[in-house]
Amino acid sequence: MNKVHFYFHSFLLILTINLVSSCNGQRQQPKESITEKTVTSSIQLKIKANKVIKPENGFNSGFLDSDGTLWFGSNGNGVYRYNGNSFQNYTEDDGLSSNQIYSIIEDKENNVWFGTQNGLSKYNRKIFTHVTIPFKDTTSVFLDKVYPVISPNAVHSLAQDKKGNLWIGTAGAGAYRYNGKDFTSYLSEIGTKQEDSLYHNWIPSIIEDTDGNIWFASMTHGGVSRYNGETHTQFMTKDGLSDDMVRTIYSDKSGKIWIGFNGNRKSGLTVYDGNSFKTYSVDDGLCNKLIRAIYEDKNSNLWLGAHLGNLCIFDGQNFSEFSSNGQTFSDILFILGDSEDNIWFGGINGIWKFNGQTVIKMTTDN
């Protein structure tokens, strides 16, 4: 199977659920290329209920903001806001750049940002604004063949650092840092060159660790990259990664970096302690090697969501599938905690809340 077919096959599966140092990957983008288009259409309350009808293709992402509000990004039906009592749905009709939502983050000014198939949307709690990223032109016949798998305009990951910078991971144009005025390009030439001799680096996950380093995952055979504010360090299989197609990264409370992969080769769950990498495989009890979501609970257990696999918990010694009244939970794409220590998880099959004793399904099928 060639790389194009592999990427496309991988993305279709998603839709159904839905050490080298360098600083030459960093480029400042001109101020005049930054444009904003404010959407003035009114925000209408579309759903008022303590449960919501599940979109046809489920959900991609979840986020808890500073007000305690939960946001859920869907596969094709916009974003859902939950205030603890009711859901409200926002779509392109309300100003979103796209109904396909991949990532959500909040900035220090209380704005909520959405990574979509058509770029960035900013919501100031009143109106949506489309923020144009000054992408380098990478148009080619190759992109037409693999769209929407590799799509430079799509924003698949978002993070905010301690300085307030917004970090943006695209599905084919590397990463960008946005300081509120200017965009700076990073890692556009990492990974494997494609048929058109361009890299089209796809970054599905970005985090900041406890030391303030920014970590980037690459799904186009670029491994992981760590940026300390001055230089990038790239980690590949030769450095200890179990695979170079990385799906998600997570920093736990102790500062360890946990890495989930696309499930190729002998990949599994890899942890970096600052000195070396260690990988847990299915032979070690790992429930599934296609890790899509990682979350640490208040008891330091790791919750692991997997594509084509069941929700799993790692207590530091053993892995076990999570179940409730005999029910397991498959294809979990996001996991997060709320202000009351409930754990929320979801994906193609809906959204659930676990209060420590009982699992409550927050979506209905009709």
What positions do the PLM features span?
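Carboxylate-rich, polar loop motifs that coordinate divalent cations or form catalytic acidic clusters
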Residues: N2-N366
